[in-house]
From Swiss-Prot:
Disulfide bonds: none annotated. One of its GO terms (biological process) is methylation. This is Probable methyltransferase PMT10. It is found in: Golgi apparatus membrane. Keywords: Glycoprotein, Golgi apparatus, Membrane, Methyltransferase, Signal-anchor, Transferase, Transmembrane, Transmembrane helix. It comes from Arabidopsis thaliana. Its EC number is 2.1.1.-. InterPro entries: Put_SAM_MeTrfase, SAM-dependent_MTases_sf. The lineage of its organism: Eukaryota, Viridiplantae, Streptophyta, Embryophyta, Tracheophyta. It comes from the Eukaryota. The chain crosses the membrane at residues 16-36. Pfam families: Methyltransf_29. One of its GO terms (molecular function) is methyltransferase activity. Residues 1-15 are cytoplasmic.
Length: 655
């Protein structure tokens, strides 16, 4: 074999070809690296990289090994390339300076001046002065106490100027919401001599006089066994206008009249209209039935305030011209004992509102003089009531003494089989019976869902955790099973509340009246029940989100629709605990944060607690407002740890 042939074979070997290619690639890399390193500097990275000298040394080692086989080509002359021109000077347009604080030196683009006024009105009219400064970003002056005349102030129900402008009050318009344009800018003071409320269940029977210092009810209703004063306390014997011998005996009579009512099982959520001091609801609670007691403000002086001080679920509400703030098919039983409402006026529109809220198959219990007295005018009222209830397909199932009980049908079959032209008519198919925020009552019969939603809920306590069928009718963005969403929410809040009970010793708080400002499906309230805290929760569904209120009632809980840009319809000093989960991050573009927290303070009892779970970015502002109000406030990590984007602001209101 010739030597030249051997050399040719070596040149053709794949090994040599790879080595030459690698050497060429290495030289190209060095050239490019040197070229770009002259023009750019690299930002800091979260991980280390090797220096260029080390890379060069490694590449030179590879080149030397290749040179032993084939000679390297002569070095190429380095090209002289001028660096790229510097970028143009950037004009600072941000509102954050180099220290990360707000700056007053920035530029903005063109804008429409009118849009600024619209934005101000959209975020709420606040009379509380809030300041921005480069040093702290947000400041608020310490808030002062209101005048003593506002001790029992409910902003949207005590707007005397607006009420005086009403052209007509025949239907009770003066008792409806009329919110002032100017928001509250001070703190509601407690009455002189205010004490920490007596704890439940003792509060069912007695409360401190100084906490609700009003004697008119004693003067008006003392003879009916409602209430009496004993030294420094009000005492509640448990009677009422139609049940002088006590609410317990009255409830026994109802149970005997309607065995299927089964309080605490089939009948879990009830509504008591014109509740007096709420003895009916107070005694139903020991039968495992939660009763929402409602009455207008000051028909009898502060009756709802007495109910709340006793620890009974209650809310100021009136049957006038607008729908009440509860969804369709909310209550298994609706009760009216001498509630002084003319159910047959205006073609029965008020009873049609009761029908909207009454669950299919539910009971309407009416204890009134027309049921049992024989005066001509009362007998005429009874005949009108019988005629109206017959036309809306209610069945009179029992009349005994002064009590009459009707039952609502389970479906629409009776409605559609009525004679043509029978009034009231069925509501239009496109009517939403759960649309209640500032919506007028309608003179029509609310249709029942053809699929039976709302009628076939489980019995208590299983219904608390059984996803109701009406869950499928909620208008919401859901890409996975809605039942799984509800169950996941319940698991989440059970874990969270369990940690609150363990770490912050909630059982020592002796909570009774609780407000959840953004309730979702009611998971927070369900967790309180599961963990054995003897309290009731007012579950609020904000108008800005999905209307989950029907699901809350189907679970055996209670709540209402509300817009937190406006005050809530309750008395000052209502709640022991106010809970707000991600409320401010959702509402900050619509509402004034300071106004919301002032409203929270109005509703919070002295000695009460506020738990705000929200975005870390809002905590500084929320904490400053809390301190301006006078709360003791501290920010805490969640169970996700210190690096999570969520924090808990815990506040206490001093007595």
């Amino acid at each position: 074999m010739k030597l030249s042939d051997v050399g040719l074979d070596v040149v053709k070997t794949p090994r040599l070809v790879k080595l030459i290619a690698f050497a060429f690639l290495s030289i190209s890399t060095i050239f490019l690296f040197n070229h770009f390193s002259d023009s750019f500097s690299y930002p800091s990275l979260p991980f280390p990289i090797s220096s260029s000298s080390n890379v060069t040394e490694a590449i030179q080692t590879n080149i030397t090994s290749v040179a032993a086989v084939a000679p390297s080509p002569p070095p190429r002359p380095r090209l002289k390339i001028s660096p790229p021109p510097l970028p143009p000077t950037v004009v600072r347009t941000g509102i954050i300076n180099e220290n990360g604080a707000m700056s007053d030196s920035f530029e903005i683009g063109g804008f429409d001046p009118d849009s600024i006024d619209e934005l101000k009105s959209a975020t709420g009219n606040s009379s509380v002065e809030e300041k921005e400064s480069p040093e702290v970003g947000f400041q608020i002056e310490k808030l002062k106490l209101c005048d003593k005349t506002k001790i029992d102030y409910i902003p949207c129900l005590d707007n005397e100027e607006e009420i005086k402008r009403l052209n007509n009050t025949d239907r009770g318009e003066n008792y409806e919401r009329h919110c002032p344009k100017q928001s509250l800018d001070c703190l509601i003071p407690p009455p002189d001599g205010y004490k920490k409320p007596i704890q439940w269940p003792q509060s069912r029977d007695k409360i401190w006089f100084n906490n609700v210092p009003h004697t008119r009810l004693v003067e008006d209703k003392g003879g009916q066994n409602w209430i009496r004063r004993e030294k420094d306390k009000f005492v509640f014997p448990g009677g009422g206008t139609q049940f002088i011998h006590g609410a317990d005996q009255y409830l026994d009579q109802i149970s005997q009249m309607i065995p299927d009512i089964t309080f605490g099982s089939r009948t879990r959520v009830a509504l008591d209209i014109g509740c007096g001091v709420a003895s009916f609801g107070a005694f139903l609670m020991q039968r495992n039935t939660t009763t929402l007691s409602v009455a207008p403000k000051d028909v009898h002086e502060n009756q709802i305030q007495f109910a709340l001080e006793r620890g009974v679920p209650a809310m100021v509400a009136v049957f006038a011209t607008r729908r009440l703030l509860y969804p369709s098919q909310s209550f298994e039983m609706i009760h009216c004992s001498r509630c002084r409402i003319n159910w047959t006026r205006d073609d029965g529109i008020l009873l049609l509102e009761v029908n909207r809220m009454l669950r299919a198959g539910g009971y309407f219990v009416w204890a009134a003089q027309p049921v049992y007295k024989h005066e001509d005018n009362l007998q005429e009222q009874w005949k009108e009531m019988l005629d109206l209830t017959n036309r809306i397909c209610w069945e009179l199932i029992k009349k005994e003494g002064y009590i009459a009980v009707w039952r609502k049908p389970l479906n629409n079959s009776c409605y559609v089989s009525r004679e043509a032209g029978t009034k009231p008519p069925l509501c239009r198919p496109d009517d939403d019976p759960d649309d209640v925020w500032y919506v007028d009552m309608k003179p029509c019969i609310t249709r029942l869902p053809d699929n039976g939603y709302g009628a076939n809920v489980s019995t208590w306590p299983a219904r608390l955790h059984d996803p109701p069928e009406r869950l499928q009718s909620i208008q919401m963005d859901a890409y996975i099973s809605r039942k799984e969403i509800m169950k996941a929410e319940s698991r989440f809040w059970l874990e969270v509340v369990e940690s609150y009970v363990r770490v912050f010793r909630w059982k020592e708080f002796k909570l009774r009246n609780v407000l959840d400002m953004r309730a979702g499906f009611g998971g927070f309230a369900a967790a309180l029940n599961d963990l054995g805290l003897d309290c009731w929760v007012m579950n609020i569904v904000p108008v800005s989100g999905f209307n989950t209120l029907p699901v809350i009632y189907d679970r055996g809980l209670q709540g209402a629709m509300h817009d937190w840009c406006e005050p809530f319809d309750t008395y000052p000093r209502t709640y022991d605990l106010i809970h707000a989960a991600f409320l401010f991050s959702v509402e900050k573009k619509r509402c004034n944060i300071t106004n919301i927290m002032l409203e929270m303070d109005r509703m919070l009892r002295p000695g009460g607690h506020v738990y705000i779970r929200d975005s870390l970015s809002l905590m500084d502002q929320l904490q400053q407002v809390a301190k301006a109000i006078g709360w003791t406030a501290g920010v805490h990590d969640t169970g996700e740890g210190p690096h999570a984007s969520v924090r808990i602001l815990i506040c206490d209101k001093r007595i």
